[in-house]
């Protein structure tokens, strides 16, 4: 049995669709499981992986803390960050706050490949953490969506 990978802090993937410029980016998977599109060289040579759900939930919690810091205690938000992951979460929170905290984009490509129960856990945690979210979007292959069981 492989050891569970350690949490390395808040993550964001390398791509954001232009239509998602106002969205919080939540990285659910890394890279692309298909990786055969001739028009896309972004993930070539990179191994696809699913992030552990616990890591995704920790990322959401990090953004929640950052939003609280920025809105409840702005003077505290000016203090130095503890680590790079905290800084990245605060940067994501800052830009998302400016956009109104209404939409979330699940990264990377084909995020619907994760088990439906895991997706439900992530979405419920997002809703509990950010009730203002009105829209969650993701890239997915039609073949992946067709395989999802009821």
Each language-model region and where it sits:
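Short, charged low-complexity linear segments at domain edges
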Residues: 1-23
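Conserved SAM/AdoMet-binding glycine-rich loop
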Residues: 65-150
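Canonical Radical SAM [4Fe-4S] cluster-binding loop centered on the CxxxCxxC motif
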Residues: 18-76
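Phenylalanine-focused residue identity feature
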Residues: 7-10, 39, 48, 70, ...
